[in-house]
């Protein structure tokens, strides 16, 4: 997961994918995510997620949230399978 403004890795907070870019795969999926991020100033990061249940890698526009409860709620609102704890590099299934 990288900061959309400076492309530097984000090392803390919880990454929550945005529903509008879920199911983005391959180079065209990555291009779709980058375009979406450039058009939505509220999105502060983008990255990828490996789903071990189906062995697929997803690209996502992402919001970084500092509070776990808020991140979980935002994840549920966006119909996400999981969010990611960037400080501890752990997936949190919802």
Language model region names:
Residues 1-94:
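Conserved, structured core segments of small domains
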